[in-house]
Amino acid sequence: GLRKNPDGKRLQEILPPELYARWVPLKERYVGKDDDINGWRPIFAAAVLYEVALRKRGFETTGVIWPTVEKLARKSKLEVTEPTVSVKVEKPRDAIKEFKNAPLDDLDCFAKTIERLESDLDLMRVRANAWAVGDVAQLRQLAPVDNASACIAVVMNAQVMQDRGYTDWPARRAEAWLAAVEQALARNV
């Protein structure tokens, strides 16, 4: 399917040797013996590795912070404003077919995800505790490797997206966020 490398190559064949050497112990530790993942595109292999590693280390990726934020907002009679950017893809089947067969520049996403897992899993707990008590200085000091932006960029910079006119996603995301901030301030201050 969509996750497999279009040319049938395996991660060992497409990753630089030093990056592949870093992947192997993380894959064995968190994903286990499942060898199918080695035939996936780096972006998809990285995403699964990251999700499984977080889960196995006791981190929840959904439903932890947001319910508390919503509860506090309701208690304070504040309306939550969520910035969103919608991307409508014309002829989605054609786009998926193109994406499936197109090369992706996803090594940076993969490398940053590996780096984050190697250096940041233990710090995530420290950062979560700092966030919980509002220790902004410690949060700034413990800024994580930003693998998410690199991985989002892979998809948004893919030729299939560029051909469909989605070239301005960072600006659209920033505009949506600023508009949501302005709406929230106007409504809640």
Question: How should these model regions be labeled?
Answer:
Residues 1-165:
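Structured, acidic catalytic/metal-binding patches in enzyme active sites
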Residues 155-156, 160-189:
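A cross-kingdom marker for long, charged
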